[in-house]
Amino acid sequence: MSASVNAEISTTNTKWRNMNILSYNQFDRERLNDMCKVTNAMRAMVATSGGCDLLKGKILNNVFFEPSTRTMCSFETAMQRLGGTTVRILPSYSSSKKGETLQDTLRCLECYGDITVLRHPEKGSVPGVAKYLKKPLLNAGDGVGEHPTQALLDFYTIQNEMDGKVDGLTIVLLGDLKNGRTVHSLARLLMNYDVKLRFVSPESLKMPEYIKEEVQKKLEFTEHENLSDVLKEADVLYVTRVQKERFENEEDYLKVKGTFDINKATLSIAKENMIIMHPLPRVGEIHEDVDSDPRAAYFRQMENGMYVRMSLLALCLKGRGDD
């Protein structure tokens, strides 16, 4: 096991062991700093040795009731690089098909594993079931509610790309802000810092009022329908897809699907050191001709997801506790 990883995990300023990760509101600047330090150590360790045996003998239950590529695979890869193993549970193989409650499913699974990652289509379902469990539970997305581990990797990416600077940035969140759980978590996580937020979306996909009411207590934000209104001032452009699966009918989806179309020409007025982020998958909102632009950070963002999730698994299972 990397000595630097062990040192960072054992010397955090905040306690982590047996922690559930359910919401952005569990993270202040101190806890974020701890996470980033451990994540940096994980990155360095993977670069030099590929992995370690920190979580040898530990089992991750990966429970996904909605489709996932990046979140599911990055958690599995994270666990395996730390020497642990994973059990993948998908709806087609779950006893939920027989009418079993989510509570019972997870209580049974934690008899076999040491930590559980859960994605579920119902808003509030993941925090709601946590009270029945004795072992750590990580929220991998609860409907249109939150996606805290995505917000954490997004924050880490912003900090890393901006050489440690977050205060003073202007961050544009663009796309489906109504249904995008990634931006719901990220906007509020950024309340820990002195940033300016710009919300850009069609009228029908604006950021929910309850989130705006919360954000305005700490941050300056403005709302726009055109990216050109704010692109010149942006340090970070965070793009999200329009989420077809959240629409009740296809006609409403098609009305807004192609609202934003980001290509090389779009970026001609943007700062040279701006970064472009996207939680992926993309469905046409960022052209592939942008991929070669050094400002395109979304694949670096995906790689960061593995390192951040390595740190979260390690901290929740091996981090500082009460002893």
Where do the model's predicted regions map?
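Structural/interface elements that position substrates and couple domains in central-metabolism enzymes
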Residues: T12-D323
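Short hydrophobic alpha-helical segments enriched in small aliphatic residues
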Residues: A3-A7
